[in-house]
Swiss-Prot record:
It comes from Rattus norvegicus. CDD domains: uroplakin_I_like_LEL. This is Tetraspanin-1. PANTHER family: TETRASPANIN (PTHR19282), TETRASPANIN-1 (PTHR19282:SF216). Structural component of specialized membrane microdomains known as tetraspanin-enriched microdomains (TERMs), which act as platforms for receptor clustering and signaling. Participates thereby in diverse biological functions such as cell signal transduction, adhesion, migration and protein trafficking. Regulates neuronal differentiation in response to NGF by facilitating NGF-mediated activation of NTRK1/TRKA receptor tyrosine kinase and subsequent downstream signaling pathways. Plays a role in the inhibition of TNFalpha-induced apoptosis. The chain crosses the membrane at residues 12-32, 53-73, 89-109, 212-232. One of its GO terms (cellular component) is lysosomal membrane.
């Protein structure tokens, strides 16, 4: 009986933390989506290793909403000893766990396919929004400067962009070497071609491979927490009358 009470309290505290983290992510996600410029001013340039090629605000909102719901279900289910809610908590966590494993397998086995899929999504956005959408341009400039890269694949991603068509030059990062992220001379297509600066996707992959132990450790830690939460929720479920 004492063991059951202890696990119940731990379940409530753990999920309360998840609930608060979810609320914080939701708030930040809404802030980034509504006023990304003030967010960048408050926190400075985003870390190059944390750059994303998707809309960061919507990603944070989605992640925050999932954590918010999970935390609420875990807290409420454990506190009220509601078997239905505990089963919902377990089921959602199991789906997330399976999706994470599937995503990791796809990322490892089908890297080329993932690159093609992301190219299909990202390159049109570069062609349309780079140089004209403030937050999008700031994120890409921070990424290209921090990682010493150009575009998603390389400089050719800008060939059909509004930025190149109207300004007749490429972003300066496409003509910079690894020691100098800026260039004084205009970055023409010929110069960008001769410099052949690597694309940001390959640079990020290289960073991940370089820090594979850290990335793997974090992934294993998250998976272990999810498994522990599922085991605890099922223990409470099975011991409730």
């Amino acid at each position: 009986m004492q063991c059951f009470k202890f696990i119940k309290v731990m379940m409530i505290l753990f999920n309360l933390l998840i609930f608060l983290c979810g609320a914080a992510l939701l708030a930040v996600g809404i802030w980034v989506s509504v006023d990304g410029t003030s967010f960048l001013k408050a926190f400075g340039s985003l870390s190059s290793s944390a750059m994303q090629f998707v809309n960061v605000g919507y990603f944070l909102i989605a992640a925050g909403a999932v954590l918010f719901i999970l935390g609420f279900l875990g807290c409420y289910g454990a506190h009220s000893e509601n078997k239905c809610v505990l089963m919902m908590f377990f089921s959602i966590l199991l789906i997330i766990f399976i999706a994470e494993i599937a995503g990791a397998v796809v990322a490892l086995v089908y890297t080329t396919m993932a690159e093609q899929f992301l190219t299909f999504l990202v390159v049109p956005a570069i062609e349309k929004d780079y140089g004209y959408q403030t937050e999008f341009t700031q994120v890409w400039n921070s990424t290209m400067e921090g990682l010493h890269c150009c575009g998603f694949n390389n400089y050719t991603d800008f060939n059909s962009s509004r930025f190149v068509k109207e300004n007749k030059v490429f972003p300066p990062f496409c003509c910079a070497n690894n020691t100098d992220s800026h260039t004084v001379e205009p970055c023409t297509e010929d110069k960008a071609k001769s410099m052949n600066v690597q694309g940001c996707f390959k640079q990020i992959l290289q960073k991940i491979r370089t820090n594979a132990v850290t990335v793997g450790g974090v992934a294993v830690g998250v998976a272990a927490l999810e498994l522990a939460a599922m085991v605890v929720s099922m223990y409470l479920y099975c011991n409730l009358k």
